[in-house]
């Protein structure tokens, strides 16, 4: 398994209480693929550097996880299919 960091920017029109269940829904893909979710850090609403889909703000969430590459690819695919997700970025942090 490899370590990944996933950043998700969600639609700011989502209610605060809808953010956690949405993230958990995405994380079920990781858990079903025998991956481990190490940390979920929701930053809340932040101003975007530029508008995405005509939205000046987004709800940021950063997820640290360990999973196989195929599982992370499926997670990214699921996120991109969801209309509440403005942008995703999957990174493999450097080992120090």
From Swiss-Prot:
One Gene Ontology term of the molecular function aspect: structural constituent of ribosome
Protein name: Small ribosomal subunit protein bS6
Intrachain S-S bonds: none
Keyword terms, alphabetized: Ribonucleoprotein, Ribosomal protein, RNA-binding, rRNA-binding
Gene Ontology CC terms, in alphabetical order: cytoplasm; ribonucleoprotein complex; ribosome
One record GO biological process: translation
Name of the coding gene: rpsF
Keyword Aminoacyl-tRNA synthetase: no
Family (UniProt): Belongs to the bacterial ribosomal protein bS6 family.
Protein role: Binds together with bS18 to 16S ribosomal RNA.
């Amino acid at each position: 398994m490899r370590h990944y960091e996933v950043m998700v920017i969600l639609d700011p029109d989502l209610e605060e209480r809808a953010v956690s269940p949405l993230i958990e829904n995405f994380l079920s893909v990781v858990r079903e693929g025998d991956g481990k979710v190490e940390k979920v850090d929701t930053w809340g609403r932040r101003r975007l550097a530029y508008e995405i889909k005509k939205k000046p703000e987004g709800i940021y969430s950063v997820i640290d996880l360990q999973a196989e590459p195929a599982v992370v690819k499926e997670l990214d695919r699921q996120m991109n299919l969801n209309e509440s997700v403005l942008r995703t970025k999957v990174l493999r942090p450097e080992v120090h």
